[in-house]
Amino acid sequence: MKILPINTKSKNYKIYIGHNIIDKFNFIIKKERINFKKSLLIVDKNISKNFIKKINSKINCEKKITFLFNSSERNKNLTYINTILEILFKNNFARNDMIICLGGGI
């Protein structure tokens, strides 16, 4: 697992990157004392539905949203970024809410 530290003027935080990281999800949440009310799971449609269910079962929050998309070079564009931003805005995501991205090419 790779930990990428992010340092800003207002807050420092970490981005966790790695294989099978979902098995460490609850450990990371407790270790970092992360509190969030909403989660957005951005998933490549090639990811199995059972794996998506497994991930959602690990996430404990008030509102869970899953956004599926086709992993294709055509879809790596501002339209998809705007779609994701619209989901965040329409659901009143805050800075302390969770975004999880899974799959190749996201």
Where are these regions (language model features)?
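A phosphate-binding catalytic loop at a beta-strand-loop-alpha-helix junction
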Residues: M98-I106
